Curated annotation (Swiss-Prot):
Record's protein name: Actin-3
Keywords: ATP-binding, Cytoplasm, Cytoskeleton, Hydrolase, Nucleotide-binding
Gene that specifies this protein: ACT3
EC class: hydrolase
PANTHER family: ACTIN
Domain of life, per lineage: Eukaryota
Pfam families: Actin (PF00022)
SUPFAM superfamilies for the chain: Actin-like ATPase domain
Gene Ontology MF terms: ATP binding; hydrolase activity
Location (main, coarse): cytoplasm
Catalytic activity: ATP + H2O = ADP + phosphate + H(+)
Similarity field: Belongs to the actin family.
Function field: Actins are highly conserved proteins that are involved in various types of cell motility and are ubiquitously expressed in all eukaryotic cells.
InterPro entries per record: Actin, Actin/actin-like_CS, Actin_CS, ATPase_NBD
């Protein structure tokens, strides 16, 4: 199918925490906003404000005091389609200011996304938004493309879920994908808890956002946790201060590395699962012997919860301890990894060789939503 070359494709990466959207060929998303939909708690509390029945993204975030906030994407999977439609509508009309019926749309999906979900996504894009063409790509695969590779294992950790996804020659290997229901949101909650132990109280959803900011600005991963704990106990060199919106200044010490340590020791959160290093190793071990070497040498970090300073060195150390002693291990942590899923989508959708891969409206009309399984894999 030949598109008018000047009409750029749209790339939308829907994460549990943030939606990243923009134009294929750009090197960064134009719009990044929270994946939330808010509805007024009390009818008519803002008389004459021209009150809407729902708010999306930053506007919902700023009016959170009078709204009930919902996340339509939980653990990477869309669970509320009405709200998801609102987020897409907001993306097209308010953030990107485009007419969806004029642009092909590339959407992303979580690894192991249920079949019915991919079909529903496809149906909404064609029937509600009348797009001329669309494609659904697996998030981790796009991150790998963004790093300039087609074979490797991606550790993708965002706000709602963490996956380890082995990929060979551009195809994810579903039998070896592992999912960990522990990600950024859990780390924020954990930091709220351990700051409370220090005597600072953070309880409301509004205060959770403050703690998320503290986490993003001050947390790091220790290379040796026990050693770091004793360093923190014997000196105040690791302490940092943070000014709260009301002007109060708080001090944070070992919490800085205790919080993200939960990625390696989920028992800190009361979870039974193994850490991200062991999950990555287990994922590699589920793959064919012949490709393991390529996976160890191309371990790519992706997503906002891999942004902690020190995480790549720690992964290198932990995986080296698990792998055969002669194995070459390389952890790739691109500086732009917070957006590498989106960037990979931008690269893919602008390749000339990709243009025949789009599902066209015509193909959809002939075959229905199931076409997505034949054309996107």
């Amino acid at each position: 199918m030949a598109f008018n070359e000047d009409v750029g494709a749209l790339v939308i990466d829907n994460g549990s925490g943030m939606c990243k959207a923009g134009f294929a060929g750009d090197d960064a998303p134009r719009a990044v906003f929270p994946s939330i939909v808010g509805r007024p708690r009390h009818q008519g509390v803002m008389v004459g404000m021209g009150q809407k029945d729902s708010y999306v993204g930053d506007e919902a975030q700023s009016k959170r005091g009078i709204l009930t906030l919902k996340y339509p994407i939980e653990h990477g999977i869309v669970t509320n389609w009405d709200d998801m439609e609102k987020i897409w509508h907001h993306t097209f009309y308010n953030e990107l200011r485009v007419a969806p019926e004029e642009h092909p749309v590339l959407l992303t999906e979580a690894p192991l996304n249920p079949k019915a979900n991919r079909e529903k996504m496809t149906q909404i894009v064609f029937e509600t938004f009348n797009s001329p063409a669309m494609y659904v790509a697996i998030q981790a695969v796009l991150s790998l493309y963004a790093s300039g590779r087609t074979t490797g294992i991606v550790l993708d950790s965002g706000d709602g879920v963490t996956h380890t996804v082995p990929i060979y020659e551009g195809y994810a290997l579903p039998h070896a994908i592992l999912r960990l229901d522990m990600a950024g949101r859990d780390l924020t909650d954990y930091l709220m808890k351990i700051l409370t132990e220090r005597g600072y109280s953070f309880t409301t959803t509004a205060e959770r956002e403050i703690v998320r900011d503290i986490k993003e600005k001050l947390c790091y991963v220790a290379l040796d946790f026990e050693q770091e704990m004793s360093n923190a106990a014997s000196s105040s060199a690791l302490e940092k201060t943070y000014e709260l919106p009301d002007g109060q200044v708080i001090t944070i010490g070992n919490e800085r590395f205790r919080c993200p340590e939960a990625l390696f020791q989920p028992n800190f959160l009361g979870l039974e699962s193994v850490g991200i290093h062991e999950t990555t190793y287990n994922s590699i071990m589920k793959c064919d012997l012949d490709i393991r070497k390529d996976l160890y040498a191309n371990t790519v970090l992706s997503g906002g919860s891999t942004m902690y300073p020190g995480i790549a060195d720690r992964m290198q150390k932990e995986i080296s301890a698990l792998a055969p002693s002669t194995m070459k291990i390389k952890i790739v942590a691109p500086p732009e990894r917070k957006y590498s899923v989106w960037i990979g989508g931008s690269i893919l959708a602008s390749l000339s060789t990709f243009q025949q891969m789009w599902i066209s409206k015509q193909e959809y009309d002939e075959s229905g939503p199931a076409i997505v399984h034949r054309k996107c894999f």
